[in-house]
Amino acid sequence: MRDAPDGGAGLAQQRAFAPVHGALVMRQGTGVMFCGDSSAGKSTLAYACARSGWTYVSDDGAFLVRDRADRYAVGDPHSIRFRPDAGELFPELAVHVPTVRPNGRMALEVCTRHLGIFTAPGCAVDHVVFLDREHRGTASVQSYPEDRALDCWAQYTCLGTGDVQTAQRRCRRLLLQASLWKMRYSRLDDAVSLLERLIDQTTSSPGGHGR
């Protein structure tokens, strides 16, 4: 997961933000967060969405702003990190050379200004989508249980004083007001198309997105 935005002091970050391990993108003003483990394809899907005209906010780490009640999160829109073989999925990435990260793993990190995509520093989170990339067949989506979502987010409440951790948990609970989904997919184009239909349906329905 990425560091908090702007590289500020750790204590200030803990007091200002609630970190969430997730990618963040936006389509026509609707914010979508992708959650899941390290192999779920968060960065890859975020970039696939951006290539289709979405706005990119962050690939692997989003930070909820604790003093806001609208589930607003910020990220690092200036770069995006891929697995070394990302050029096999996205030919335009083949010219970039993987480098060794501090953890010893190879990764491909690319400045978004070289990719011709829309970016933004943050957005409100209207949908949270938990990814299952191992599925074979047509992409599908279903509601995701709130308790499982809270369990997933809880693992990132490990820094700061007890009061800070409590405030971070309270902030993450605001994400339960967003629409929670689990999406199974194997093909990126199917996943992007399904997400676009989901957003179109929910934003056009009475009451809009959210719960």
PLM region spans:
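Glycine-rich, often acidic-flanked micro-motifs
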Residues: 22-37, 51-211
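Post-Walker A alpha-helix
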Residues: 45-46
